[in-house]
Amino acid sequence: MIRNSANGIFFLILTALFFSCDKIDAPYAEVNVSSIDTLQFPSPSFAINPDEPRRVLIEDFTGHTCGNCPTAAIQLENLIASSGGKVIGVAIHAGETFAAPAPPTYPEDYRTEVGDAIDAQFGITSAGQPNGMVNRIKTGNVYYTIPNAWSNRVNALLNNTPQADAQIGIKAYYDEEKERLIAYVHAGFLTSLSGNFRLAAYAIEDSVVGDQKWYNQGLPNDHDENYVFNHTLRGNVSSLWGEDIAINPQAGSVHRKVWTLKLKPEWKPKHMKVVAFVYNRDNFEIIQPGEAKPEL
């Protein structure tokens, strides 16, 4: 990644020009905007914050028959809680070994098409679980790392480069009539960058109750039948790998998308949220993530 310094006055002028408008410009990718009642679900304004802090996305690859995975989930929760909103988590149920249904004790299948695609691309579950990625940054020949190393990687990112290169703005709604999420997503670049950048968005659900194997808890057969899954990846709101938004973006440029996703009957709107992020498609590195709960 190459940063190009920008004159402060020039940046302020760009900010005023690009971010003062209150209306999202058409066209929108992948969505027939006429299908959205913009009076009921209005598009948001977006103003860039020059002091936007860097945030980090941790993707935790888990499974309901992985007895060590709940410990990794606790580590993720602790990092989120201690970060002051700078760490965002996504729990991805993937792989045949620990995420496949195993009835009658573990009948559910929390796997998703997008989760399987991510797993195949980065080879996570073939290396064992629990494992995860921190901003999809490659170290050596691999992208994944064990949960005990997440904290050091997060701290290095937040301490070494505390100011973000981009800002994510999300406004999400639940359209009860059509049983769908509507997600307006903005990506604004605070610095000029080299690379080919994409914007992607996922649907996440908290408070999913189900069966989980959990070692060393004194449970019969290590089985917790009322385990609470948080940050559960439910699907992609954008296309599978997101949408191209910019090649070599300049400081002050802003890009806007709107997507919809129909919810499955078992998904609870009050527990849903949208996680979106901008990433460099040349190396998969996530530049900045964000998250928002839908307005019900």
Name each region found by the language model.
Residues 91, 98-296:
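Short, conserved sequence motifs used for protein processing/export or organelle targeting and
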Residues 1-5, 12, 16-53:
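Bacterial Sec-dependent N-terminal signal peptides
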Residues 45-97:
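Local sequence-structure signature of Cys/Sec-based thiol-disulfide redox active-site neighborhoods
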Residues 13, 50-53, 58, 124, ...:
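Generic detector of ordered secondary-structure context
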Residues 23, 68-71, 134:
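Disulfide-rich extracellular modules and peptides
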Residues 8-9, 269:
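Generic alpha-helix initiation/capping and coil-helix boundary signal
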